[in-house]
């Protein structure tokens, strides 16, 4: 197995420019593909997850011209030209869920599949929602999970569509992005969410990006959404993908743990991503944080006790960035509790179980619950821990921070960061100092 040894490091400082947001990149690619007109996308993320989306769109007949982090997409005016396709989408939830919905109303025969872990990640709630409007979708192996077979169907929207919101916000995102493509009674489609909607900021990203492409979604709280139906997305001409706020969390934490000053460029107060809220969580733990419209600075810890304060917080809104808090909790002066993180169970791996296992390797006492994690830091971090990453990019990036505790750490399968941030470890090494 490949591995990477990091540290020991005692400080971290410098400036890092973030790669484009994964969540925004894949949404914008699909919206541009479905729109009328040509869209020039800049600062597009180059990663495993965006590559599978680009590959799928190409197979569906979308004209794409890529040059570095710029991609020119010629829209299909609401319908993919390819009426048969076999689409491999890796482990990219941001590709498989929205594409499944778009294909379900496209009148073709399609197969959607991915890596083995993708076939363990639920999609049944989305399929149930699509079946309510007439979609013909079959499960190939296990009920409720990919691979999927999608067949031509007569689509009609004549009643509110109900979808669960407590497993993944991507099911709602997929429906919202697809419903403008179909005709509905009274010219509008209504989606009603059953249960508490998790990861609300990601749905907000979807709605904001749809508006950039000319479609305005109205919402009543987070339970009822009204979407114009039978309308056409219109290209905004040019759109820039802002930096990835989830990826920012590792560098912001490094600036706190390693003293800084460390500046992250590409996200800030003007960001549309909820994960910029990570900076507020870090401030609650005592980090010295300042923020501009598109940058965030961290200069160590804002008191003289030398350790972060423990935190007890509901992380329902920022589940991805919360993983970084779990590792930062190793550097706190007491026990931290991360609540309302049940969605971790159905991500790239079971992140609650994985995080608990790996935190224990570096000496933490960890209590693992169905939707929470309690982390008590050790007196001293265990050196030379070999961290398993479970083919999960965020596990690898989070645990790089252990090296800032003055101990060496080994990251197994470091190339898994290719899912969202292929050169992460090069960027981290440029900032961390012995």
From Swiss-Prot:
Chain sites annotated for binding phosphoenolpyruvate: 22, 93, 121, 170, 351, 394, 419
Catalytic activity: 3-phosphoshikimate + phosphoenolpyruvate = 5-O-(1-carboxyvinyl)-3-phosphoshikimate + phosphate
E.C. numbers: 2.5.1.19
Entry keyword rRNA processing: no
Enzyme class (EC, first level): transferase
GO molecular-function term, one example from the UniProt record: 3-phosphoshikimate 1-carboxyvinyltransferase activity
Quaternary structure annotation from Swiss-Prot or TrEMBL: Monomer.
HAMAP family the record matches: EPSP_synth
Record's function text: Catalyzes the transfer of the enolpyruvyl moiety of phosphoenolpyruvate (PEP) to the 5-hydroxyl of shikimate-3-phosphate (S3P) to produce enolpyruvyl shikimate-3-phosphate and inorganic phosphate.
Protein's recorded name: 3-phosphoshikimate 1-carboxyvinyltransferase
Species assigned in the record: Burkholderia orbicola (strain AU 1054)
Name of the gene: aroA
